């Protein structure tokens, strides 16, 4: 890259001028001394993160992999629990666990949680678990599941949490690829009042493992009502028998070198097999703590409500670990926002005096389908801020939550990250001092994340208004340092994903930067449409559709067209006050052209009741495109409702296949 281009790229990456001066100065510290910035970040967290031994070296790069805080000794469980108890926080509530389906509420304090985790740790040792062993956890949200994660971390075992409800095939893939020899599961779960036979799904999964896998034990969390659970002698054990194994064992923590693994978390890939991202004790701990402080303003006085599940990275980072590192109270909610009532989340917020909320655009749009009336029945005045991630928070959903539900009294802040990044990489720093919110934009790279928007063909740093792809140019402490068991895929999928992005972490998102430095996402890079030579993001068209009062949710994908190369096809979920009709379809098409101009060409719009989404709430546009173009659907193990696929099929029959 020529010098003037490098200078321009640095200038474009500078933090937005709309940030307060002290925040801009903080951002620039990372630009000027990257390693020094992250060393100071770790040192500044000394009252919440404990080091048994300070690191010898801040950063070590062995492309494409890397290490942080080399030679340091820590343990995230010790920092989260033992250290907090030593600081006098033992009597404070650590977790409040609630089930929407059963109505059960349980609270555990820091000292109670520490004692519970010690017992789990001793029992794990009692069944033969050693440092470095992988433990699959297949349990619904709750204190037992979070406690098992912490117990694994405590003894140096590596937890592999699998979303409770994943299919046997998906479980088997994750157990096999991680090399887990143990599964901890619950006998049964429930969702919207329907029972889920979790243990039976685990049994099916274990039958699919290849010969020689060496699986050892399944531990089953059961209740007195679970009388008919199939158990395999010598392999399976009930919860009481598991806890009895703690006898004669100790629940002491292990001092972990900074770069020893903490957990593995599978993430979706373009192939049938998931990618197994990994995180280590030190870098992950520092990163999720700092982003919690800088972006969310997490602090010890918070009652924090993340609506995610521990099966996802948000659940790991901001249901379990970061809230405990900050010494606050975290609510673990098992269930949906609208079952058995449409005000379940609002009820949780009011009863617990929630101060901070982390949710997803899908969650907000789901609440919007019931209107603002359920919110009006509750006192939400304790809430100080809402942060949102998972997909782009479209302006209509932001406006509804910001203005209708919270009446402009608090900020609703969008931000962006991935499983592989463990925490925010793009976001408005609420904790440090915000710039104005621009609805539809996630704002700018977070402190200590050196990001750019480049042309994926030649790596050229792009200017204001030029569409390209988001890349990270330097590894940061929360970035996955490798893929478990597949370093070659790590190199090719992330650091050499495109001809122009070699040596850059390829996030896979299409984006552009505006004159104030705000980043606007257009969708996944492979979902950007090219209509008559115009590059148009699917998110842009979805935002236009959702800005119409009739539309609650929309999914858009490009489909082949002989004349224009591609045109847009859309499926929408309507507001309860509107009915499908040809007149409404035409009105929506006209509305999109009015919002976006004549360059956008819509082939058709299908009306459906639900979009195909992953269990973490992301719209599965690839499934829609595959259905439209008669392609293979691929891996559907993460889909929330299989019936949504049938809805798309029926809608396609009505509008005609492409």
Regions from the PLM with identified roles:
Residues 162-188, 202, 350, 357, ...:
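AMP-binding/adenylate-forming catalytic core of the ANL superfamily
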Residues 444-448, 460-497, 536, 632-633:
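Conserved ATP/PPi-binding loop(s) of AMP-dependent carboxylate-activating enzymes
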Residues 283-303, 313-356, 369-370:
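Conserved AMP-binding/adenylation subdomain of ANL enzymes
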Residues 237, 321, 328, 355-359, ...:
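Gly/Ser/Thr-rich phosphate-binding loop
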Residues 91-93, 215-223, 231-266, 273, ...:
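Conserved pre-ATP/AMP-binding loop-to-beta segment of ANL
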Residues 77-78, 91, 95-149, 167-172, ...:
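Conserved AMP-binding/adenylate-forming core of the ANL superfamily
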Residues 1-108, 112-119, 125, 206, ...:
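N-lobe entry segment of adenylate-forming
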Residues 150, 154-241, 353, 360-361:
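Structural core segment of the AMP-binding/adenylate-forming
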């Amino acid at each position: 890259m020529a010098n003037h281009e490098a200078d321009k790229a640095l200038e474009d990456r500078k933090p937005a001028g709309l940030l307060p001066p002290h925040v801009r100065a903080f951002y620039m510290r990372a630009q000027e001394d990257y390693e020094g910035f992250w060393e100071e970040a770790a040192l500044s967290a000394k009252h919440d993160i404990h080091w048994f031994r300070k690191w010898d070296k801040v950063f070590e790069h062995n492309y494409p992999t890397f290490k942080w805080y080399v030679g340091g000794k820590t343990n995230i469980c010790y920092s989260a629990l033992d250290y907090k108890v030593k600081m006098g926080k033992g009597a404070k509530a650590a977790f409040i666990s609630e089930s929407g389906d059963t109505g059960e509420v349980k609270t555990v304090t820091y000292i109670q949680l520490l004692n519970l985790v010690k017992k789990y740790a001793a029992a794990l040792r009692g069944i033969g678990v050693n440092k470095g062993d992988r433990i699959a956890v297949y349990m619904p949200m709750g204190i037992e599941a979070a406690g098992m994660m912490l117990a694994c971390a405590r003894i140096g075992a590596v937890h592999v949490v699998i979303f409770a409800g994943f299919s046997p095939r998906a479980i088997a893939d994750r157990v096999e690829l991680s090399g887990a020899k143990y599964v901890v599961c619950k006998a049964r779960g429930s969702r919207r009042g329907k029972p889920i036979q979790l243990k039976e799904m685990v049994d099916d999964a274990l039958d699919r493992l290849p010969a020689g896998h060496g699986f050892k034990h399944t531990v089953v969390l059961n209740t007195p009502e679970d009388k008919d659970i199939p158990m395999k002698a010598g392999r399976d054990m009930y919860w009481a028998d598991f806890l009895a194994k703690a006898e004669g064992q100790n629940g002491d923590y292990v001092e972990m070198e900074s770069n020893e693994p903490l957990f593995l978390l599978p993430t979706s890939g373009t192939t049938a097999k998931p990618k197994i991202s990994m995180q280590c004790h030190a870098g992950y701990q520092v990163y999720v703590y700092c982003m919690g402080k800088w972006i969310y303003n997490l602090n010890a006085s918070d009652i924090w409500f993340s609506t995610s599940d521990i099966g996802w990275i948000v659940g790991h980072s901001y249901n379990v670990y970061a809230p405990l590192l900050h010494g606050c109270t975290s609510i673990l909610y098992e269930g949906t926002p609208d079952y058995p009532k449409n005000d379940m989340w609002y009820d949780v917020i009011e009863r617990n005096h929630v101060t901070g909320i982390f949710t997803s655009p899908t969650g907000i749009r789901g609440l919007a389908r019931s209107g603002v009336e359920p919110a009006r029945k509750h006192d939400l005045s304790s809430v100080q801020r809402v942060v949102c991630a998972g997909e782009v928070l479209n302006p209509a959903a932001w406006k509804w939550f910001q203005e209708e539900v919270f009446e402009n009294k608090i900020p609703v802040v969008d931000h962006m990250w991935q499983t592989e990044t463990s925490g925010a990489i793009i976001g408005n720093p609420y904790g440090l001092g915000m710039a104005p919110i621009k609805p539809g934009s996630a704002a700018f790279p977070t402190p200590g994340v050196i990001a750019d928007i480049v042309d994926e063909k030649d790596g050229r740093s792009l200017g204001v208004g030029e569409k390209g792809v988001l890349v990270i140019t330097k590894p940061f402490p929360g970035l996955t340092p490798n893929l478990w068991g597949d370093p070659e895929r790590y190199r090719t999928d992330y650091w050499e994903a495109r001809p122009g992005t070699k040596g850059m972490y390829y996030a896979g998102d299409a984006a552009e930067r505006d004159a104030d430095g705000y980043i606007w996402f257009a969708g996944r890079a492979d979902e950007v449409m090219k209509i008559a030579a115009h590059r148009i993001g699917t998110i842009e068209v979805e935002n236009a559709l959702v800005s119409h009062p009739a539309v609650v949710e929309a999914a858009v994908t490009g489909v082949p067209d002989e004349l224009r190369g591609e045109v847009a096809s859309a499926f929408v979920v309507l507001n309860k006050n509107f009915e499908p009709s040809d007149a409404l379809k035409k009105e929506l098409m006209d509305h999109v052209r009015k919002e976006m101009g004549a360059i956008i060409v819509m082939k058709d719009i299908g009306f459906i009741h639900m979009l195909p989404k992953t269990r973490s709430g992301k719209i599965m546009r690839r499934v829609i495109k595959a259905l439209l173009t008669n392609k293979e659907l691929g891996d559907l193990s993460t889909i929330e409702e299989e019936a949504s696929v049938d809805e798309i099929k029926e809608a396609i029959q009505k509008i005609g296949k492409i």
